[in-house]
Amino acid sequence: MQRARPTLWAAALTLLVLLRGPPVARAGASSAGLGPVVRCEPCDARALAQCAPPPAVCAELVREPGCGCCLTCALSEGQPCGIYTERCGSGLRCQPSPDEARPLQALLDGRGLCVNASAVSRLRAYLLPAPPAPGNASESEEDRSAGSVESPSVSSTHRVSDPKFHPLHSKIIIIKKGHAKDSQRYKVDYESQSTDTQNFSSESKRETEYGPCRREMEDTLNHLKFLNVLSPRGVHIPNCDKKGFYKKKQCRPSKGRKRGFCWCVDKYGQPLPGYTTKGKEDVHCYSMQSK
């Protein structure tokens, strides 16, 4: 289990590196105050002393994936790569296939490819064009207006007479919005009043349908829902019959060294006279048994 933790951290860090972009972009993000997501332990002399000698025949040596400090052979262009494989060489990035339906899963399975980083950047810029700057918003609007189907022979006076730009039309829109807002407010108030009425009717219906024991049990269970720490001390779930009234024998459970006890009540939960046996475990309630 302890050996699996560094592997998981290495996989998480490698995935973040692949998704966050090249080292230049990551350095810019760190200088902007974002900072790295995962901080690796420094590769000091003690960590480097535990590394095995690097392979003898390697075109390029790179660090192990994730937070590893040892050196290993870099992957060349076109070789398969992924989260758990070695790093790609200089100027290369591990990318899933363009037609891959599940790109992240492909990287986890090692089905990516080491491709040229500059080609990846050009492809990303082509597929994901940068949003227009705030200062060029008006220019883009003018370009879209110029490229519309509107004939250039239409005079400017005809555009001004458009009812959308008429002051009276603007006032009508404001009035309609005000009416819609008032009607929506009335609708919300009406729905809240109707909901309160329904809740009151359901509460009154519950009072007539269920007995006092059932109501106490439901109130206790509802109270337990809002407790952050559930403790058996002080929590008593009553013993109810099918009609919601109290059964004759009510008991409290044992709490550690303190033994539980039982007592006798009537159908409304009132203690029965003559049954002063509170504190005894074996209690027999004979008369007035609730059905």
Swiss-Prot record:
Positions of the UniProt region annotated as Disordered: 130-162, 189-211
Secreted found in the keyword field: yes
Domain of life: Eukaryota
Effect of residue 215 to E: Completely abolished ALS binding
Domain IGFBP N-terminal intervals: 36-117
Keyword field: Apoptosis, Disulfide bond, Glycoprotein, Growth factor binding, Nucleus, Phosphoprotein, Secreted, Signal
Modified residues (Phosphoserine): 148, 194, 201-202
Thyroglobulin type-1 domain segment(s): 210-285
Entry's Gene Ontology molecular function annotations: fibronectin binding; insulin-like growth factor binding; insulin-like growth factor I binding; insulin-like growth factor II binding; metal ion binding; protein tyrosine phosphatase activator activity
Induction statement: Up-regulated in the presence of IGF1, insulin and other growth-stimulating factors such as growth hormone, EGF and phorbol esters.
Residue spans of biased composition, Polar residues class: 191-202
Protein modification: Phosphorylated by FAM20C in the extracellular medium. Phosphorylated by CK2; resulting in decreased nuclear localization.
Annotated Low complexity bias: 146-156
Tissues expressed in: Expressed by most tissues. Present in plasma.
Cross-referenced Pfam families: IGFBP (PF00219), Thyroglobulin_1 (PF00086)
Keyword Secreted among UniProt keywords: yes
Signal peptide: 1-27
GO biological process, one term: positive regulation of myoblast differentiation
Residue positions with a glycan: 116, 136, 199
SMART domains, alphabetized: IB, TY
This protein's domain notes: The thyroglobulin type-1 domain mediates interaction with HN.
Purpose: Multifunctional protein that plays a critical role in regulating the availability of IGFs such as IGF1 and IGF2 to their receptors and thereby regulates IGF-mediated cellular processes including proliferation, differentiation, and apoptosis in a cell-type specific manner. Also exhibits IGF-independent antiproliferative and apoptotic effects mediated by its receptor TMEM219/IGFBP-3R. Inhibits the positive effect of humanin on insulin sensitivity. Promotes testicular germ cell apoptosis.
Subunit record text: Interacts with XLKD1. Binds IGF2 more than IGF1. Forms a ternary complex of about 140 to 150 kDa with IGF1 or IGF2 and a 85 kDa glycoprotein (ALS). Interacts with humanin; humanin competes with importin KPNB1 for binding to IGFBP3, blocking IGFBP3 nuclear import and IGFBP3-mediated apoptosis. Interacts with TMEM219. Interacts with RXRA; this interaction modulates the transcriptional activity of RXRA. Interacts with LRP1; this interaction mediates cell growth inhibition independent of IGF1.
Matches recorded under PANTHER family: INSULIN-LIKE GROWTH FACTOR BINDING PROTEIN (PTHR11551), INSULIN-LIKE GROWTH FACTOR-BINDING PROTEIN 3 (PTHR11551:SF3)
Name by which UniProt lists this protein: Insulin-like growth factor-binding protein 3
Organism of provenance: Homo sapiens (Human)
Gene: IGFBP3
